[in-house]
Amino acid sequence: MATKTVRIEQIGSPIRREASQRATLVGLKLNKLHRVSELEDTPSVRGMIRKVAHLVRVLDDAAA
């Protein structure tokens, strides 16, 4: 069985954001605007996306 994945794109800059938000973007493998990252769809990744929801956009949401 294939694991579910989620694709996210960074749409906001981490400049003048809290260090924890910058670290969350690094954890999501994002570092520059309009970069796309594909990660395994797990509760921890979903929580990280929720933490920086104002800086990222979910491109593919298999759960919806």
Curated annotation (Swiss-Prot):
GO BP terms in the entry: translation
**InterPro entries the UniProt entry points to:** Ribo_uL30_ferredoxin-like_sf (IPR036919), Ribosomal_uL30_bac-type (IPR005996), Ribosomal_uL30_ferredoxin-like (IPR016082)
| Gene Ontology terms, MF aspect | structural constituent of ribosome
Pfam families for the chain: Ribosomal_L30
| Similarity field | Belongs to the universal ribosomal protein uL30 family.
The record describes its quaternary structure and partners as:
Part of the 50S ribosomal subunit.
This chain belongs to the protein called Large ribosomal subunit protein uL30
Q: What is the lineage of its organism?
A: Bacteria, Pseudomonadati, Pseudomonadota, Alphaproteobacteria, Hyphomicrobiales
